[in-house]
Structure formats: structure tokens, C-alpha cells
A protein has these predicted regions:
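Conserved lysine of the Walker
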Residues: 40
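Active-site acidic catalytic loop and adjacent metal/ATP-binding pocket
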Residues: 177-184, 191-192, 284, 344-396, ...
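ATP-binding glycine-rich phosphate-binding loop
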Residues: 161-185, 218
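Short phosphate-coordinating micro-motif centered on Lys-Gly-acidic
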Residues: 3, 98-154
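Active-site activation/catalytic loop segments of kinase-like enzymes and analogous catalytic loops
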Residues: 317-326, 392-428, 443-459, 472-480
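ATP/Mg2+ or Mg2+-diphosphate-binding catalytic cores
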Residues: 451-505
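ATP-binding pocket architecture of kinase catalytic cores
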Residues: 182-313, 317, 324, 351-352
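An alpha-helical support segment within catalytic cores of ATP-dependent transferases
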Residues: 289-304, 309-310, 314-358, 371-373, ...
Length: 505
């Protein structure tokens, strides 16, 4: 794939570099070819600065004499190499670029000095021209082809919107395949959500994929339908301002920057935000929820039930990923069957005749505090697309047993009591049955998340999630203290006695 970009100024070249930085991943190699003064260094510095969050005072020295400059504090670690002064392949080899590739993006000026390739994930940019005008010829390989094609689709979408002149800036998302960017124009900011339809994964059970069994959203339709309906009820989901449903792109209202997780990390007082979040959940539990809602364009979106098949396939992640992560082997058929049988009995107890909309990830990364609003609208809701019809206890678990940040047990108990008080005041409420469901679904969620974090590390190379495992283990053990979970506790004591030690870390 070859693309040509005509740059009329250094600023235009810098803009192209910043745009390409949105797609930066460790393991990529960007080769910068061209004569002296052709714009290679201008591009490289702008690329690095964009990965540093656009900090104008970020120090980016030239690698001309040092040969290599490393940047570990950028969003993705970068190594900037200048091979101009090297005279032999041996000197190039001694730099160890191949060893650096796994954990860095490599920006290499004068790549002609290389003998053979370093990576299949390469993008070659050839610079030519004189004066202010430059021609950048981009030749892409492997995933860079997909990125450049997607980038062109996004540019077309943004160009036709009210934010056509906005700079596209990286916005931190979650562990999913969705991407986010921030666009600002005339002092107004919006988020761009990039969510193309998910390709079918491998068949895992009963001729169905994992995402189909677990009822995970396959594309933008779920986001639009769920957000629109919740917004219409007065909840603070992000208003969708512009949409290309076919290409999986949306411009959405920005709900600010006071994310619950960030606020917690900063040591801010979370009493009001958390109580407000509890009020949202209590309000949702008191509503009658539809199984189908209108979707823009005249069609209908149907919600799935958070049934035993979905809950069970999530639980299986512990056997598939966490077990080999801890034990370095696979579970025996007997251990797996005992696990499944124990869970079958427990999940039968949380079936509910009148399910409520369950967002599933009602926790600190997806909640925003907006004190300038009133009532329930003070809590911003994002990441709603995997909403299903389930037990109201599930989202309470998500909030009070947050996998990403510590929620002290005493504070969680206080909030749990506040939730029960709100439900009791609103009408008949089975507090004992709810506590049982909370423990069962809490154990289910913790079991699932231990498997997910092990999978993220092993399959996706996202090892940072492992640091959350002790916290999740503590939640699991607390849920296992409920007398109705005695059988499940015995299974864990038999097969994972290390959990009790790991939870103390």
C-alpha cells in the first residue's frame, strides 16, 4: 500500500506525524528515508512529542551523535535512531535494534544502512522536495495497511462534521478493541469513538463464539441504542452528536475528566460520588426495562438476558487462563466438572423474573463525576454497550468490588446499606435474598476477572493487569465467606490455597 501526502509546511508534516502517532504500538518500525534537511527529524520529533501528550517543553534531543535516544515516559516507549554516521552492518547490529523492538516503537532515520528487515510491522516514509514543500510517500506493510485505511475513513468522517478543523488527540480507553480520540474546536471538546464491527472469533462452545455466548457488543449499534435510551430517561450517558453507523464511528459528548478511578488515585473524597452512583443503581432497579429499544435509522436493538450460559462461559475463563497462569498446567476433568456443577447450583439462585438493565462494568473507569449537574445526572456513564438484562445486584458488585481501585470493606458495607435503605424506601425489598445474590455474583465476577487478567497478560502482553489480581482475590475470598457459598469455597481451598496468601499482597 502506497499513500502520498503533500506537505506545504513543517507544521503540516508535524500534523501528519501526530496523526500517525495515534496508531503507535510497541513492535512497530517506522523507517524515515530522505536527504539531509528533507524533514525526517521534524517528523520524528513531532511523532515523539505527540506520544508525550503534546508537551511543547518535552525534551527531544537529536540522536545524530548518540545514535539512539530512548523515551520511556511516552504513551508507548519510543527509540529514535539515526544511522547516518554508521559505516558497516556490524555497527548497526551492535545497536541491538532488534532487541529493542518488542517493547518500543522504533523510529529509524537513514534505514538504508540496515541489512535486512527488523520487523514485519513497518511503515516506510520517503521525504522529498525543497523549500517549504515536501512530498511524503508512505509505504505500509502488515497492520500499518489496516491502520492507514482506517485512518482515512476517520478523516473522511471528521471532515464532514462540525469538527473538521480539530486536531485529533489520543484519548485513553479500556482493555477492549475500541479506540477513542479527543477532538477540540472553538473551545468545545468531543470524543470520537472508533468501534468497527467486531470480526467473529473462534468457536468455543456449542458452535458459538465467546462473544456470542457472553452477549458482548459486536459493533456501534449497541452503543447508540443503549446510550440514546438511557439519555432519554435522564441518565448522563454521552449524547451522540454525529454518527456513521456503517463504519462504526461516532462523535460523542465529552463528560469531562473527573473519572472515578482517577479521582480515587488522586486521593480525592469519594463519598459523594459513590453515594450518587448508588442512587443511580437504586433508581435503575426500580424501573421496568424494555427488552428492545429503537435504533437510529428505523430499526430495533434487542437486549440479551444475562443468562446462565453467559455467566458460565465467563466463569470458564478461570479454568482456561487463570489455572495455567498459576499452576502451569490444565485442570483435570474431575476438577472442571466439580467446578461447573457447583456453579450450576449457585447460578440457579440468581435467576430473576423481572431483570433490570445491567451495564456489567459499572465501575471506576466508566463513571464520571459531574457535580455541576443535579440528582442522578451527576454521574456520567460510559462503556454501556454490553448492557444486558440481569440481576440488579451485579452492577452493585461492579461498583463496590472494583477491580481497578481499592474500595475499603467498611466503606463498601456502608454503601451497600445505603443501597438497601433506598430500595426498602421505594417498596418491597428482599434484603436477605439480595445479599445472597450479591455474594454469588461477586464471586462470579471475581472469578471471571481473574481469568480475564491472566488472559490479557498471556495472550495480549498486557502484564500491568496482573497487579490487580490480589485485590480481586480479596473480593473473591470475602464473597466466599457467605454460608451459601461453602461448597465453592471448599473447591477454591482445594485447588487454589495460594489465593489466601496472594490476597494479602
Amino acid at each position: 500500500m502506497i499513500i502520498e501526502f503533500a506537505s506545504s509546511s513543517p507544521a503540516a508534516t508535524e500534523g501528519m506525524a501526530a496523526e500517525l502517532s495515534l496508531w503507535a504500538r510497541a513492535g512497530q518500525c517506522i523507517l524515515l528515508s530522505g536527504e539531509l534537511g528533507s524533514g525526517k527529524s521534524t517528523f520524528a520529533r513531532a511523532f515523539i512529542r505527540a506520544l508525550a501528550g503534546g508537551q511543547q517543553d518535552f525534551d527531544i534531543p537529536s540522536p545524530t551523535f548518540s545514535l539512539l535516544q530512548s523515551y520511556d515516559s511516552t504513551r508507548v516507549p519510543v527509540v529514535h535512531a539515526d544511522l547516518y554516521r554508521l559505516r558497516s552492518a556490524t555497527e548497526v547490529e551492535e545497536l541491538g535494534l532488534g532487541d529493542l523492538l518488542a517493547s518500543n516503537v522504533l523510529l529509524i532515520e537513514w534505514p538504508e544502512k540496515l541489512e535486512g528487515g527488523i520487523s514485519d510491522e513497518w511503515l516506510r516514509i520517503s521525504f522529498s522536495g525543497t523549500g517549504q514543500n515536501r512530498l511524503l510517500k508512505l509505504q505500509a506493510q502488515e497492520s500499518w495497511v489496516t491502520y492507514l485505511e482506517r485512518n482515512a475513513v476517520i478523516n473522511d468522517f471528521v471532515t464532514q462534521s462540525a469538527f473538521r478543523n480539530a486536531a485529533r488527540i489520543f484519548f485513553e480507553g479500556d482493555a477492549s478493541a475500541r479506540r477513542y480520540e479527543s477532538l477540540t474546536a472553538d473551545s468545545k471538546s468531543v470524543l470520537l469513538m472508533d468501534m468497527p464491527n467486531r470480526p467473529d472469533g473462534p468457536i468455543v462452545k456449542n458452535n458459538r463464539t465467546y462473544s456470542a455466548i457472553a452477549h458482548l457488543a459486536e459493533g456501534m449499534s449497541a452503543v447508540v441504542a443503549i446510550n440514546d435510551y438511557l439519555f432519554g430517561l435522564g441518565y448522563s450517558t454521552a449524547e451522540i452528536l454525529d454518527l456513521d453507523l456503517g463504519n462504526g464511528l461516532a462523535l460523542m459528548e465529552s463528560l469531562g475528566h473527573d473519572v472515578f478511578g482517577k479521582m480515587t488515585a488522586e486521593g480525592r473524597d469519594m463519598r459523594k460520588p459513590m453515594r450518587a452512583a448508588i442512587e443511580v443503581l437504586a433508581d435503575m432497579a426500580g424501573r421496568d426495562w424494555p427488552r428492545s429499544v429503537p435504533l437510529r435509522g428505523g430499526s430495533t436493538y434487542h437486549l440479551s438476558e444475562y443468562d446462565s450460559d453467559a455467566l458460565s462461559i465467563e466463569i470458564d475463563l478461570l479454568l482456561s487462563w487463570y489455572w495455567p497462569h498459576v499452576k502451569r498446567d490444565s485442570p483435570s476433568a474431575a476438577a472442571a466438572e466439580e467446578f461447573a456443577a457447583t456453579w450450576r447450583g449457585l447460578l440457579a439462585r440468581v435467576e430473576v423474573e423481572e431483570p433490570v438493565w445491567t451495564l456489567r462494568d459499572f465501575h471506576s473507569p466508566n463513571l464520571l463525576w459531574m457535580p455541576e449537574r443535579s440528582g442522578l445526572r451527576r454521574v456520567g456513564l460510559i462503556d454501556t454497550q454490553d448492557c444486558v438484562l440481569g440481576h440488579p445486584a451485579y452492577d452493585v458488585v461492579s461498583l463496590l468490588q472494583d477491580a481497578r481501585v481499592d474500595v475499603e470493606f467498611e466503606f463498601a458495607d456502608e454503601l451497600f446499606g445505603y443501597y438497601c435503605d433506598l430500595r426498602t424506601a421505594a417498596g418491597p425489598f428482599d434484603a436477605k435474598g439480595f445479599a445472597q445474590a450479591f455474594a454469588i455474583l461477586g464471586a462470579q465476577r471475581a472469578t471471571k476477572i481473574l481469568g480475564i487478567f491472566a488472559r490479557l497478560s498471556k495472550r495480549d502482553g498486557k502484564h500491568l493487569y496482573l497487579k490487580h489480581m490480589p485485590r480481586v482475590s480479596r473480593y473473591l475470598l470475602r464473597n466466599l465467606q457467605h454460608p451459601d457459598l461453602a461448597g465453592l469455597r471448599m473447591w477454591y481451598e482445594k485447588h487454589f490455597p495460594s489465593l489466601w496468601d496472594g490476597a494479602r499482597k
